[in-house]
Amino acid sequence: MLHKVSLGVGNIDKYRTIETRGLIDEIVSLGEELKGLRLCHINSTPFGGGVAELLVSYIPLLRSLGIKADWQIIRGDRRFFTITKGFHNALQGAPFDEIKKEGLKRVYQSNNLTNAGELDPNYDVFIVNDPQPAAL
């Protein structure tokens, strides 16, 4: 199984003191429609970067709405993460000449196949938040 980030349940009501337009009530109402949904966010690291900064508070808030949300982290060897760092930078406009290197696709696919084999099939929805596990 993939590593599951340990998080608790948040309290959406604490935001009522700063929100005055009824948005919390709307979020709670929309959450009723999703109550019980099994949702898994997947990314490559639990620390640093925008995804981790968002999910650390977002997952507990989803749970406070009754959504069975989890956050899991993929595994990969050093070469996989070097290659996918290049993908990440290329998506932001940097050149990525390594794409032509022999075996790059094989390393990427092999690591993602290993991770795919560790996915828990008991989720209704998977959200992939990084280019590293995009092939899942």
Predicted regions and their residues:
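Catalytic cores of nucleotide-sugar-dependent glycosyltransferases that transfer UDP/GDP/TDP-activated
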Residues: 1-136
